[in-house]
Amino acid sequence: MAAALPLQPSTTASATTTATAVALGEVEDEGLLASLFRDRFPEAQWREKPDVGRYLRELSGSGLDRLRREPERLAEERAQRLQQTRDLAFANYKTFIRGAECTERIHRLFGDVEASLGRLLDRLPRFQQSCRNFVKEAEEISSSRRMNTLTLNRHTEILEILEIPQLMDTCVRNSYHEEALELAAYVRRLERKYSSIPVIQGIVNEVRQSMQLMLSQLIQQLRTNIQLPACLRVIGYLRRMDVFTEAELRVKFLQARDAWLRSILTAIPNDDPYFHITKTIEACRVHLFDIITQYRAIFSDEDPLLPPAMGEYTVNEGAIFHGWVLQKISQFLQVLETDLYRGIGGRLDSLLGQCMYFGLSFSRVGADFRGQLAPVFQRVAISTFQKAVEEAVEKFQDEMTSYTLISTAAILGSSNTPATVPATQPGTLQPPMVLLDFPPLACFLNNILVAFNDLRLCCPVALAQDVTGTLENALTKVTKTILAFHRAEEAVFSSGEHEIFVQFCTAFLEDLVPYLNRCLQVLFPPAQIAQTLGISPTQLSKHGNLGHVNISAIQEPLAFILPKRETVFCLDEQELGPDLVAPAPELPAEQRSMEPVTEKREPGEPLPQEPMEGEPLPAEPPSEGGAIGSVPCPQPGEQP
């Protein structure tokens, strides 16, 4: 009711004020209605229906009486509406039923139509794809038909192309290399034009396999005993195949020929070192020379006419061949040294001659390796000599362990009559016969002479110092063995045994050692040593003990055993003395000096190259005790 007050007209307000008040009143009415009917009519519901709002505004503008009658009026109007609706339903119920049935049927039909349309829409993509596939297959069939027609028309040409791999394989296996190379060139042209065609790719792959087989066959031919014309053809085929560069082709050629050479060398029997090395020398000399001749005929070591392109590097192709030749020579020297160390008997000079001839033949191709042979033979010669000397020392030590001075006394007692000395040739070295009274010394000298005889077969001047040092070491060990024997037996020596032992030491120092010194002078003449060093023979003494043994160093440990002499002979260590004469109570006046007794020679005249007695260059080393120039070595207790 309070909200209806502003709706009363005011006589004093103007028209503008009245309109404003009315608008404000409507707003206030809506707010009041919203608060009054909040529980029954939600605000959103009556705001969406204009009739409800209009009716409510109409009620808000009505008087009290009308508002009191409004519920009754609404009830009557409702009853009236219900009666009208009931009458309408009774009058038209068949229509309503028919309409409901039609509506239901229409609703059901629409559902069926909707389901059918859904199934149709689901099948349309598959149908569309099937149509596309049909069109595509039709196009493919059409294209295939056109291709089959074209293939039928070009059947002969296609068959020839398809038979290329079989024809290529036949040519390769029958060694028709020229025809195989022409087929390969034709296939390369096909590949450049039709590389995307699978059939062409298959043909190319099969032809490449045949080319690989042909490459293996050509390289295998180089691994056989092939002659120069065949080598030229094979290398020509390899160059036309364009598989290797020029440097790689040279390496392949040398590898193949090297494999053939190694197969020949491997087939040589290895049981006998001398037979193995002689056959190796012959095979290497003949076949290596052939390989070098073939290489130089096929490949040129001249500089290329055109400079290398930008970004390319040059290969020193000449170094490939020279490196291979050096490798082969190095391998030959290794085999030579191995067989020499295995032992070849007394045929070292013959083997040296063969090797020198081998090196000389290689000088014609610029690969003279004779300078490399000298160190090999020197090492083998000194090693063999050292081994023989060591064995001689060991045998001497073994004999001294069982040596007794009693047997020596019997020998000396029975040798009052002079022994018959065999006739010797002029200019030969006769071993001291006094050593026959002392079997250990005689056998030791025999073994050393056997070592000297073997050394004479190949005795370079460069070994003078090593041979001298080896002999000095051996004599030093012999001296120590004699001293050890003296220390062990001195306590039980009788006066006679002591005298015999003194004679034993005297024979060792004054007969055996000087004789070995003379042998060294025969092996290494002082004049030859001086000429090698580029000095005069008089200056040779400044270079130490070259070619002679230091007798003083060997004599010094035994000095306390030897009796003191009134005149002591001293070998000047700076001169080469051929011998120490046997001690005598007195010397002739002309020999009472400190100078060694030497033969009369002109100044600068070399010592004669005298062979040891009865020792020419033998094919086999002389046997111990039976060689000419050796002292017979009796057993202890045996009569000489």
Curated annotation (Swiss-Prot):
Top-level taxon: Eukaryota
Annotated PANTHER family: CONSERVED OLIGOMERIC GOLGI COMPLEX COMPONENT 8 (PTHR21311), CONSERVED OLIGOMERIC GOLGI COMPLEX SUBUNIT 8 (PTHR21311:SF0)
Annotated region described as Disordered, given as residue ranges: 580-640
GO cellular component: Golgi membrane; Golgi transport complex
Role of this protein: Required for normal Golgi function.
Disulfide feature: none
Organism of origin: Mus musculus (Mouse)
Pfam families on file: Dor1 (PF04124)
Coiled coil: none
Assembly behavior: Component of the conserved oligomeric Golgi complex which is composed of eight different subunits and is required for normal Golgi morphology and localization.
Alphabetical GO biological process terms: glycosylation; Golgi organization; protein transport; retrograde transport, vesicle recycling within Golgi
Name of this chain's protein: Conserved oligomeric Golgi complex subunit 8
Family: Belongs to the COG8 family.
